Amino acid sequence: MAIKFLEVIKPFCVILPEIQKPERKIQFKEKVLWTAITLFIFLVCCQIPLFGIMSSDSADPFYWMRVILASNRGTLMELGISPIVTSGLIMQLLAGAKIIEVGDTPKDRALFNGAQKLFGMIITIGQSIVYVMTGMYGDPSEMGAGICLLITIQLFVAGLIVLLLDELLQKGYGLGSGISLFIATNICETIVWKAFSPTTVNTGRGMEFEGAIIALFHLLATRTDKVRALREAFYRQNLPNLMNLIATIFVFAVVIYFQGFRVDLPIKSARYRGQYNTYPIKLFYTSNIPIILQSALVSNLYVISQMLSARFSGNLLVSLLGTWSDTSSGGPARAYPVGGLCYYLSPPESFGSVLEDPVHAVVYIVFMLGSCAFFSKTWIEVSGSSAKDVAKQLKEQQMVMRGHRETSMVHELNRYIPTAAAFGGLCIGALSVLADFLGAIGSGTGILLAVTIIYQYFEIFVKEQSEVGSMGALLF
């Protein structure tokens, strides 16, 4: 079944656009340059509006997911990284359910990656059509078939650019991956904007600045009651406040602290006597992968629910999946789930919301913890990081675990790696829930992604620096 599936995909993989692997070792300075170019292209696409749209001022159905999916409404980056992570989610679920199996051979791995890219392109086309036909840019009947086709083509080409930019970095030309880079940039931009935004918003209390820090100084300067001004700056509703900012900094610190948790397994060289080392198994063994896949699952559920609600709003099954309400308090118009499954899988808006609807909070916590643990556990099987894969890597490096023979290494690693993957995913989910309940800026999922990605880039810099010798030699 598995080989047949991969062989069916093979003819399509040949015609897919592909970035060739570098024929030489790419220097660190070149990697930094290519990473900067990739980021520049992404940011430019985030600012180029789609040609032909009649309106994008209606309530945004994906407002709550845009920070995580690195998308920007009404621009070429409307879809963001959603097609990539959705295709990864589908392939992982198929592999995890043993519907397809990926062998250890480079050929099977390459075919698996090709299948993921193919699904990514198909999903890009599908999401583009859904976005246009559900009226996100105006009534399709008023725009006409030509304009609808033009918008769909723009979204597809932009999605293809994102796929290739991600592959460019993954193949070794840049640092990290395009997905991680785009997510971290989007989240950090959101946090800085919510802290220092000079945009004014007309509230029931008068004109206020959106940025939490700027609002603090503005309230202190304009209000005669300074104590009340401080209270508003720390606890104001529907706009970023200082407690949100403090919660964000706190979650950053907690995640960085947990990044250092690991178990070091002693290993030794099978060839050279007396050469010892350690193999680290981190608490966050699968890093941010569980939260990315969980976000992809929820975002696609939102897309389906929104699409069905727009067409069959009175249907009972559609209402059970999700009912939506438009709101514009404290920012742009956006749609938010107020009932059905989508409501219970979305984070509570604040700690007060937790007290008002504890069932919602409990269901959300169970879903986050369970899904993150599941995705983390299954990811190691398809990503080459399972106990069997690690034992094979150590064997190729002629390393063995101290006190164990080569044949027993897999059994010993199985005691640690699956547990670390599941428990690490559980911790990622718990930290995300904590950040949501504390009201951290950018959502709990967004903060988790930003911290883990920034920490990954920090580790890359440290590794490169140790190889070169100094930061100056590294960059100049």
UniProtKB/Swiss-Prot annotation:
The keyword Transmembrane applies. Expressed in proximal and distal tubules in kidney (at protein level). SUPFAM superfamilies: Preprotein translocase SecY subunit. One of its GO terms (biological process) is response to type II interferon. It is found in: Endoplasmic reticulum membrane. Changing residue 344 to H: Reduces cotranslational translocation of APLN precursor/preproapelin. Residues 1-33, 97-117, 166-172, 262-288, 376-420, 463-476 are cytoplasmic. Its main location: endoplasmic reticulum. The chain crosses the membrane at residues 34-53, 77-96, 118-138, 145-165, 173-193, 241-261, 289-309, 355-375, 421-441, 446-462. Keywords: Chaperone, Disease variant, Endoplasmic reticulum, Membrane, Protein transport, Translocation, Transmembrane, Transmembrane helix, Transport. It comes from the Eukaryota. Residues 54-76, 139-144, 194-240, 310-354, 442-445 are lumenal. GO terms for cellular component: endoplasmic reticulum membrane; membrane; Sec61 translocon complex. InterPro entries: SecY/SEC61-alpha, SecY_CS, SecY_dom_sf, Translocon_Sec61/SecY_plug_dom. GO terms for molecular function: calcium channel activity; protein transmembrane transporter activity; ribosome binding; signal sequence binding. It is a multi-pass membrane protein. It holds the Pfam family SecY. The SEC61 channel-forming translocon complex consists of channel-forming core components SEC61A1, SEC61B and SEC61G and different auxiliary components such as SEC62 and SEC63. The SEC61 channel associates with the multi-pass translocon (MPT) complex. It is linked to Tubulointerstitial kidney disease, autosomal dominant 5: A form of autosomal dominant tubulointerstitial kidney disease, a genetically heterogeneous disorder characterized by slowly progressive loss of kidney function, bland urinary sediment, hyperuricemia, absent or mildly increased albuminuria, lack of severe hypertension during the early stages, and normal or small kidneys on ultrasound. Belongs to the SecY/SEC61-alpha family. Component of SEC61 channel-forming translocon complex that mediates transport of signal peptide-containing precursor polypeptides across the endoplasmic reticulum (ER). Forms a ribosome receptor and a gated pore in the ER membrane, both functions required for cotranslational translocation of nascent polypeptides. May cooperate with auxiliary protein SEC62, SEC63 and HSPA5/BiP to enable post-translational transport of small presecretory proteins. This is Protein transport protein Sec61 subunit alpha isoform 1. It comes from Homo sapiens.
